[in-house]
């Protein structure tokens, strides 16, 4: 900590107001769980991010990414090194039109819910199903978020990203190709999916979406329907990361139903609980630790596997220092 502080504190690149040391992360995640970041850095723009990535690589300082904090479980130890937030990449703009198509660029730091509200205000259709979705545009693209049978990739035209490669770190453009995408999978994920910025990591900076002109009132109604549906299903009743496990069509039933049929709704581990109202939500019920949540996830996996033969795949990313 002291060594990292002395390096970054005395480097003009990490100017005052863009970096915080030993930053508590609980308020920044939907789980309200996890240890601190040794350093949390918010670059002011894309060029600032590029300079920082080159500096961190040159000085062999580990780095990770955080988006909206809604699909991650931060370890109780938190993050070593520098955790980078792209919240300042928050611009939304129309960049072109073709017939009835409208091309909208949104920065990675834009909150998805803010983008859907912006689309309503500008009478643009195509994002209604993402109304009320927590998280950021960068995270939604990275995870290929899927809501009500529509994936974020279904609306993509192109993506600007940065390829992390030491002193060769550079900006690049990606044109949407459907063969690169799958159910909650994108060409920007590594295997295993991680928040860590490793060599050749592709970091989403902005995305261009293809939308269409529509009637503002109709778009607003459809968007609000999704918001209210999330509320009625208890998405926001307790701190959680939403769906804990991916669905798998080969299993014949949604993950939540498999968990419910295994008699696991309401099961507790420390302060963590399988939500009594939804089998696929694991919630922070009583000041749970990250270890409580992870242990409960593993218990659910084992029980469902023992009863059905199916191994549920977590959608939640285990982030930070789990050593």
UniProtKB/Swiss-Prot annotation:
Active site per the UniProt annotation: 243 (proton donor), 315
EC number(s) per entry: 1.3.1.98
Catalysis performed (reactions): UDP-N-acetyl-alpha-D-muramate + NADP(+) = UDP-N-acetyl-3-O-(1-carboxyvinyl)-alpha-D-glucosamine + NADPH + H(+)
Key words, A-Z: Cell cycle, Cell division, Cell shape, Cell wall biogenesis/degradation, Cytoplasm, FAD, Flavoprotein, NADP, Oxidoreductase, Peptidoglycan synthesis
This protein's pathway: Cell wall biogenesis; peptidoglycan biosynthesis
Gene Ontology terms: biological process: cell division; cell wall organization; peptidoglycan biosynthetic process; regulation of cell shape
Gene Ontology terms for molecular function: FAD binding; UDP-N-acetylmuramate dehydrogenase activity
Entries under Pfam families matching the protein: FAD_binding_4 (PF01565), MurB_C (PF02873)
Location within or outside the cell: Cytoplasm
GO cellular component terms, semicolon-separated: cytosol
Primary location group: cytoplasm
Obligatory cofactor(s): FAD
Superkingdom field: Bacteria
Protein function: Cell wall formation.
Family statement: Belongs to the MurB family.
Protein name: UDP-N-acetylenolpyruvoylglucosamine reductase
